[in-house]
Each structure stands twice: as C-alpha cells, then as structure tokens.
C-alpha cells in the first residue's frame, strides 16, 4: 500500500514532458522593474493600473527610473581612484595595466613592483645632518639604565610609513640566488615619507 501512495504523489514521465513543453511554448515574461522590488511590492499580486489621473509625484517617479540602453556607444573605462595609502600620486595620463593605478595587482592583490620601482620615493638614508666636534661630551650613565633600545624586524608597523612594495616588508630583494638590500627602502621594509623642507 505504501508503494501505491508513493506512486500517486509523483507525476508520470509523460506529465513531466507535457509540463515542460507547455512552459517552453509560453512567451518569456518581461523582467520586473527593480523599483517595485525596492519598495517591497514583491509580495503583492499584480494589480491593474487605476483609472484615476496621475498626480505630479507619480509622474516624476515614473520618469525618474526610465532606462534607455545605448549599446552603440561603449562607456570609457572609469578612472581608478587614487589609493590614499600610496606614498605617491600617478601622473595624469599614466595607466598601469597590471594594477590599474592602485599600486596593487588586480589578479592577486600583491604590490605592483613596476609601479613601486617607478614612482615610490626612496627612503632618505641620511635624514639628519651630522656635526663633528673636537671636544668630548660628558657621559651620563643614569639616563640610559632604564631605556634599552628596541630592535624590530624590517617592515614592522612601529617604524611608521607604508609597507615597501618592492621587498614587501622583508628589507631584501632577490634575483635568482642573490639576495641584496632593497634599493627602495634601504632594508627598512617600509617607505617612510617625510614632509619636504625648503
């Protein structure tokens, strides 16, 4: 008996084929406008338009959402936004196909080394002038007892600046089997931009 009730619930093969043919023979429905979905009309059944004259607010609503596709004129590609975390600005007519002027590759999100090599400012190795004097300075041992220097790895955020795009924070660059200090950040692992003094 359970087999008979189970067979009664399922449609036969012929019924399924007829239903598919019936659905295919019907013309496709036009897509519903997005404005109705945004206002929560999806749960209401389709209503006939009223015969009352339209008010000015409904007329402006109907005209504000009209869309006329123009496939004959392709839009120009949008100019990418300048990444505020980059320590440089791109020239006006320059476009990098790898990163789209964001400084980071579109395909994998890693830094675009060609842009970093070309536009990133190099760290200033000698940031403060050194003055040599002939006299000896007195040494105060009490001042240095509590504060020991803090050693950090290259690329540590405590150094400030932006992570170097050439070495990606390691402070070193590789070429085949050779490893050298990064020419952009000089081994710091970060690009530290300082305001220009004039």
Swiss-Prot record:
Q: Where is this region: Disordered?
A: 1-86
The organism's superkingdom is given as Eukaryota
Keywords linked to the UniProt accession = Acetylation, Cytoplasm, Isopeptide bond, Ubl conjugation
Major location category of this protein: cytoplasm
**What Gene3D superfamilies does the record point to?**
6.20.20.10
Q: Where is the protein situated, by its record's location annotation?
A: Cytoplasm
Give residues where N-acetylserine occurs.
2
Residue stretches of biased makeup (Polar residues): 48-67
Q: Which GO terms describe its cellular component?
A: cytoplasm
InterPro entries named in the record = Hua1-like
Ubl conjugation found in the keyword field: yes
Q: Where are stretches of biased composition, namely Basic and acidic residues? A: 1-23
The annotated crosslink position for Glycyl lysine isopeptide (Lys-Gly) (interchain with G-Cter in ubiquitin) is 3, 18
Q: What does this protein do?
A: May be involved in assembly and disassembly of the actin cytoskeleton.
- PANTHER family found in the cross-reference section: PROLINE-RICH PROTEIN HUA1
**What family does the database annotate?**
Belongs to the HUA1 family.
Q: Protein name, please?
A: Proline-rich protein HUA1
Lineage, uppermost ranks:
Eukaryota, Fungi, Dikarya, Ascomycota, Saccharomycotina
Whichever gene encodes this chain, its name is HUA1
